[in-house]
């Protein structure tokens, strides 16, 4: 088995080195099993600084980014100014200096003070660490495996509602997080995609700013967050919590071509007497069950209330043990 970091990934050498060394310390040497696409773009130290500068400039209108430099890196990628992993093998110093100079000019125009001396030194050291891995044309490798009939499991990041095209724009990430992103992020044909598993929580969460029609601001929302340990994986920020939004879920099923749904974290709702599910939005007094062009604070969620199952689902060993109320909840969602 091998692992491949595809062309659609934005690779931060610093974070990569930290994770790889952590794995090595636990007895998992990945240098022989992990390949990296030459076409993956590199997150530069100045990308992180730009991320912070842009957020600071937005003031109260900030999006709430992770601060990892994702947006600025995608900006360079789309404007054809990016630095890629494969550039490590060809004129890297020249390409890096050109990108850095452009970033510094932008930062001067924003009057943003910064010092990347230490970060840059660590970043350059991490680049040397990166070179020990096999840098490949990943699209050829992956497609050859598919031709040989081997199984390929693709893993993306983030949910449908953070997709740059179909999410709650502008409070989204900078890439396509839907199923189709697998094709462009790995270089495989849509014909090679088999089953599409849609994984969702039994409730809704969101990190950072942006619209959230079913968000709960009371003790129920706090309880869901505490029981679900809802904190951002990257930033550690407390996630906003709310009831399940079936308007958004149906939209995600449609956009991704989901063939099977998988619900997780149902045990978080074990202790609730009743559970709500949003089945429609009320916009300007009119109900709709179609996800709209834009979501704002004026949207009212229309709920159906269902009885809770009041059972510890972590003790369940088979579907036959599911309580009647839980099965009713599943049937309603279906």
Predicted feature descriptions by range:
Residues 1-334:
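Non-transmembrane, aqueous-exposed alpha-helical and coiled segments at domain scale
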């Amino acid at each position: 088995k091998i692992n491949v970091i595809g062309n659609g990934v934005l690779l931060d050498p610093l974070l990569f080195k930290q994770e790889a060394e952590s794995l090595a310390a636990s007895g998992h040497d990945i240098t022989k099993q992990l390949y990296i696409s030459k076409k993956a773009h590199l997150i530069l130290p100045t990308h992180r600084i730009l991320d912070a500068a842009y957020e600071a400039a937005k003031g109260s209108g900030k999006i709430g980014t992770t601060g990892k430099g994702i947006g600025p890196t995608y900006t360079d990628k789309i404007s054809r100014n990016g630095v890629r992993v494969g550039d490590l093998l060809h004129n890297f110093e020249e390409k890096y200096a050109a990108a850095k100079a452009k970033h510094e000019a932008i930062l001067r125009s924003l009057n943003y003070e910064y010092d990347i001396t230490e970060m840059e030194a660590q970043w350059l050291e991490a680049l040397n660490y990166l070179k020990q891995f096999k840098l490949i044309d990943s699209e050829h490798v992956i497609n050859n495996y598919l031709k040989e009939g081997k199984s390929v499991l693709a893993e993306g990041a983030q949910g449908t509602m953070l997709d740059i095209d179909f999410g709650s724009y502008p409070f989204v990430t900078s890439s396509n997080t839907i199923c189709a992103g697998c094709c462009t992020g790995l270089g495989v044909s849509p014909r090679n995609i088999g089953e599409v598993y849609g994984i969702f929580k039994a409730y809704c969460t969101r990190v950072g700013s942006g619209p959230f029609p079913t968000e709960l601001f009371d003790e129920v929302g706090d309880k869901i967050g505490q029981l679900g340990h809802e904190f951002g994986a990257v930033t550690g920020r407390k996630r906003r919590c709310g009831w399940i939004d079936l308007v958004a879920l149906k939209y995600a099923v449609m956009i991704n071509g989901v063939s099977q749904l998988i619900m997780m974290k149902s045990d978080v709702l074990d202790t609730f007497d009743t559970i709500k599910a949003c089945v429609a939005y009320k916009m300007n007094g009119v109900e709709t069950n179609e996800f709209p062009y834009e979501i704002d604070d004026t949207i009212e969620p229309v709920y159906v209330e269902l009885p809770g199952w009041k059972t510890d689902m972590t003790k369940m060993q088979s579907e036959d043990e599911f309580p009647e109320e839980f099965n009713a909840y599943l049937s309603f969602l279906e």
